Amino acid sequence: MDCRVHMRPIGLTWVLQLTLAWILLEACGGSRPLQARSQQHHGLAADLGKGKLHLAGPCCPSEMDTTETSGPGNHPERCGVPSPECESFLEHLQRALRSRFRLRLLGVRQAQPLCEELCQAWFANCEDDITCGPTWLPLSEKRGCEPSCLTYGQTFADGTDLCRSALGHALPVAAPGARHCFNISISAVPRPRPGRRGREAPSRRSRSPRTSILDAAGSGSGSGSGSGP
């Protein structure tokens, strides 16, 4: 009984953190950062119960004077237009997190870390897109802004740094090659943009997880090494 009492709050915290992750992915639409620290989200349960989530100020300096949003479906101005590949990837990730959240509530799935390949694919698909900071901030605080609109590539060292910075303890990153981790499957990813640096293209293409990742909603034990069934 005592063990059960201690375990339930931990499970609830993880569910709330996962909920926050997919809601912010949906709200950001792939063009703005995932900026709400995975821990210390004051009043999150109440906001989720009311079906609303307050997102703090916008990203770029030119948008700093806009007012903070206060209702569902009303979000700050975007900082640039997302690339098709980044937007598509984040849409798939958001849907996978939503499915994972539902399975978690039903007790079908246990908490698993993110596959390292998923993080690298996220970074590869969004490297040239705008992000507004390396971490998420608590929902009760106003968001700070970088001096300029920086890209993922300018902000994060690699995919692992991206996941650890943006998602924190809500969804930790598994060790490279881990066999039991959280991943997603993308059937078709838009072609790389012409502006991508040619010297990086070969290494990107060699990373199969960028275009083919395991299904998070239907697979509880993804293969971080990329080995198929």
From Swiss-Prot:
Q: GO CC annotations?
A: external side of plasma membrane; extracellular region; interphotoreceptor matrix
User: What are the disulfide bonds?
Assistant: 79-149, 86-126, 119-163, 132-145
Is the keyword Membrane assigned to this protein? Answer: yes
**PTM comment, free text:** Not N-glycosylated.
Name any one GO molecular function. riboflavin binding
* InterPro entries per the UniProt record, alphabetical: Folate_rcpt, Folate_rcpt-like
Its placement in the membrane is given as: Peripheral membrane protein
Q: What top-level branch of life does the organism fall under?
A: Eukaryota
Main localization of the protein described in the UniProt heading: secreted
| Regions of compositional bias (Gly residues) in chain numbering | 219-229
Q: Which residues form the signal peptide?
A: 1-30
Q: Which UniProt keywords apply?
A: Cell membrane, Disulfide bond, Extracellular matrix, Membrane, Secreted, Signal
Region of interest (Disordered), residue spans? 189-229
What is the reported tissue distribution?
Answer: Expressed in peripheral retina (at protein level).
Q: Where in the cell does this protein reside?
A: Secreted, Extracellular space, Extracellular matrix, Interphotoreceptor matrix; Cell membrane
Under the heading PANTHER family, the entry gives:
FOLATE RECEPTOR (PTHR10517), RETBINDIN (PTHR10517:SF19)
The entry assigns this protein to a family as follows:
Belongs to the folate receptor family.
Q: What does this protein do?
A: Riboflavin-binding protein which might have a role in retinal flavin transport.
Record-given protein name: Retbindin
From which organism does this entry originate?
Answer: Homo sapiens
Chain's gene name: RTBDN
